[in-house]
Every structure is written in C-alpha cells, then in structure tokens.
C-alpha cells in the first residue's frame, strides 16, 4: 500500500511539482493545503500517513502547525520542507514534533522514505 501524503505549501507551483514527483515515485498524494489552518483541517479529514509541511506559510510557521498536527487523535508523521537550509532553523527542527527536514531542492521519494525510516536529516 502506498504512503499517503498531504502537501502543505503556500506556493501552488511547489505543491504541483511535489505532487508530480511523489506520484511518479509511488506515493499517494491525498490532498494539498496552502496554509496552516487548511493543513490541520485536511489532515483531520484525509488522515494522511505523512504531511510534507513548508516551514514558512502565509498564516503561520510550520513548527506551530506541526505541534497542532501532533495533537490530533491520529497524528500523521510530519516532514518539514523549506527553500532555506536546515541550518537556518538551528535546533528548532530537532526539538519539533516532526520526522525531520528536507530542503525543497533535495525533495525525492528516496529522501522522504529515509526520513520516515527514522533519520532526522536527509539533506
């Protein structure tokens, strides 16, 4: 059974690119959201296995959204993505309620699977 993914990013172009890439690599993209409120609502309704979550959203930051997702009855795994480097966020990634971080330029199914397998940083 394919891994079910919700993509959350305020840029439609990245959501489209990520969808194509992940579908081509065997993931089931069950939905998209463009902001934090939409992410929490969609995760509750769609119950994805993983949420691919932009760190900088128009209405909130990804760390706060990740914390809200962790409080859901069936919390998904959360992987943060950003156009910035992981080092720009310091230890916030390590202390966050997430599986880890992927730089947007490094996004691939293999990297996502690596993080879901337990590694905190794949790029």
Where would I find each of the regions flagged by the language model?
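As written
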Residues: 62, 93-102
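Short amphipathic alpha-helix used as the core "switch/output" element in two-component signaling
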Residues: 63-74
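Conserved sequence signature across two-component system core domains
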Residues: 8-9, 33, 51
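The feature encodes the CheY-like receiver
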Residues: 58
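Two-component/phosphorelay signaling modules centered on CheY-like receiver
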Residues: 12-31
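Hydrophobic/aromatic residues positioned on beta-strands within the core alpha/beta folds
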Residues: 81-82
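His-Asp phosphorelay/catalytic-motif detector in bacterial-type signaling
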Residues: 2, 47-49, 73-77
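Acidic catalytic/metal-coordinating carboxylates
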Residues: 35-38, 61-64
């Amino acid at each position: 059974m394919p891994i079910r993914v919700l993509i959350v990013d305020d840029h439609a172009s990245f959501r489209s690119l990520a969808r194509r890439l992940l579908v081509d690599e065997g993931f089931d993209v069950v939905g998209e959201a463009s902001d934090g409120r939409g992410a929490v609502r969609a995760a509750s309704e769609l119950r994805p296995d993983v949420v691919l979550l932009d760190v900088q959203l128009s209405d909130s930051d990804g760390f706060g959204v990740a914390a809200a997702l962790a409080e859901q009855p069936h919390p998904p795994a959360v992987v943060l993505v950003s156009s910035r480097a992981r080092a720009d966020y310091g230890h916030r990634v390590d202390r966050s309620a997430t599986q880890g971080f992927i730089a947007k330029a490094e996004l691939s199914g293999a990297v996502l699977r690596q993080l879901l397998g337990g590694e905190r940083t794949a790029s």
